[in-house]
């Protein structure tokens, strides 16, 4: 799928080339004395409440200062609020995500909103998603679906027709057929988001598509070819309960209106949600229509300001110049920078482009680990043990230039420690790339890397 995106959409883009914006070297600089701004379910938190929050989110005395620094820097570049009072739960791989999704959908009382790049009739514990959604619709629960036209091009039309006939509102995002487009024909603008919102109170966001690739025995066309064993897909999602869910709801309805979805009955889409936990979350929606690629700016500013460590995973590592500079500069100033990257992918060219950057990364001191015996699809970042991100954005050009993305930034030590524990498991199953052996790779491999670089903007 990824290779097909690059080929077909990349050819279209040649007529009007775009590139990732170069960011100012001073981006994200903020005074450490600037008071972080945090909102709760009843509005802005006081200085005393913010102070108590940062103390609670820090496990070590030194973490408090790091946390305040990252809060101030992120505040200078992000346009969405940092929301306190959240409960977050990391979900490892498709099985855990689908189980959490199906549980939330099954408990829905008012509405279910789903927005996914790939939307297939996945199942969990023997229950099909389509059957569950239609059953909830039969109970009077509103069900609204946005699926990306390109990402879900392999999903049978009959599946969406069945949902519509059962009363589910279905919107096709940026139809590949220009005759069906309602918001202007822009085939390169793809909805890469993965969002579930239930009753305006619970949400799941991250890298997991509604794809049968995550199942032991894939049934959709996005899975392994017939007769071939299914490959394990490694991915990460985040379940959020609390006031920050409203931001994901806003993003969903922004796309619904943009794509001229049918007018919906007011079902209390934004209920008053009391604090459910102690996490602080910032939801960042990015779009090529915006003047600033918000998550891109945020993650680069976080890496540029790192003092101790940067740990990141990416399904498609096709770094922009600013991403390369941020990673190598951090390593050169003594920050431990570790990257978890795939050695196999549904986009071989993205692997080749990533490989073309390894020499510079290794020379700067970046530690690179490649997974094996699985397909890495996770997009996560941890900085200084206090700043964490889980979402749909990769370290690539497409996430900046063409895709609509959504990422959740969680501030505090607890989530960072959970993610680091996941990384520890991943390191154990990965192999390290060493500078000496990497320099001895074949001329054929180097030639493949150079060729793939021609297409890196669209990968």
Task: Specify the residue positions occupied by each region the protein language model found.
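Charged, low-complexity intrinsically disordered terminal segments
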Residues: 18-459
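Bacterial N-terminal signal peptides that target proteins for export
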Residues: 1-7
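C-terminal motif of bacterial Sec signal peptides marking the signal peptidase cleavage site
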Residues: 13-16
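Residues within alpha-helical transmembrane segments of multi-pass membrane proteins, especially transporters
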Residues: 8-10, 340
């Amino acid at each position: 799928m990824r290779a097909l995106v690059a080929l077909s959409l990349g050819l279209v883009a040649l007529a009007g080339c775009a590139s990732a914006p170069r960011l100012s070297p001073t981006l994200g600089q903020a005074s450490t004395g600037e008071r972080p701004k945090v909102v709760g379910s009843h509005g802005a938190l006081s200085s005393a409440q913010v102070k108590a929050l940062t103390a609670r989110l820090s496990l070590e005395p030194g973490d408090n200062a790091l946390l305040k620094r990252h809060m101030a820097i992120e505040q200078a570049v992000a346009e969405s609020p940092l929301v306190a009072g959240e409960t977050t739960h990391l979900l490892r791989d498709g099985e855990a995500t689908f189980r959490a999704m199906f549980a939330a959908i099954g408990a829905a009382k008012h509405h279910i909103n789903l927005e996914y790049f790939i939307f297939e009739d996945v199942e969990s514990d023997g229950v099909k998603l389509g059957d569950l959604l239609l059953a909830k619709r039969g109970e009077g629960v509103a069900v609204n679906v946005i699926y990306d036209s390109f990402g879900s091009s392999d999903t049978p039309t009959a599946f969406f027709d069945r949902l519509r006939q059962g009363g589910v509102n279905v919107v096709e995002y940026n139809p590949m057929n220009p005759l069906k487009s309602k918001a202007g024909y822009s085939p390169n603008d793809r909805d890469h988001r993965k969002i579930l919102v239930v009753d305006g109170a619970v949400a799941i966001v991250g890298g997991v598509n509604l794809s049968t690739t995550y199942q032991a025995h894939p049934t959709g066309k996005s899975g392994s070819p017939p007769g071939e064993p299914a490959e394990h897909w490694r991915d990460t999602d985040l379940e959020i309960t609390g006031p920050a869910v409203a931001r994901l709801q806003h993003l969903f309805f922004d796309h619904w209106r943009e794509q001229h979805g049918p007018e919906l009955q007011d079902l209390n889409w934004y209920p008053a949600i009391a604090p459910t936990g102690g996490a602080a979350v910032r939801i960042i929606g990015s779009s090529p229509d915006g003047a600033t690629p918000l998550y891109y700016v945020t993650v680069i500013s976080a890496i540029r300001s790192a003092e101790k460590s940067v740990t990141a995973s990416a399904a498609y590592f096709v770094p922009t110049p600013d991403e390369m500079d941020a990673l190598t500069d951090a390593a050169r100033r003594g920050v431990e920078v570790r990257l978890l990257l795939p050695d196999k992918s549904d986009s071989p060219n993205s692997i080749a482009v990533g490989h073309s950057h390894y020499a510079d990364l290794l020379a700067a001191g970046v530690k690179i680990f490649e997974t094996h015996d699985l397909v890495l699809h996770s997009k996560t970042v941890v900085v200084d043990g206090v700043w964490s991100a889980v979402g749909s954005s990769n370290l690539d050009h497409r996430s900046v230039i063409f895709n609509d993305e959504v990422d959740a930034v969680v501030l505090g030590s607890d989530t960072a420690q959970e993610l680091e524990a996941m990384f520890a498991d991943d390191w154990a199953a990965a192999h390290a790339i060493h500078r000496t052996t990497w320099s001895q790779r074949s001329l054929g491999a180097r030639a493949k890397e150079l060729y793939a670089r021609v297409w890196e903007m669209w990968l």
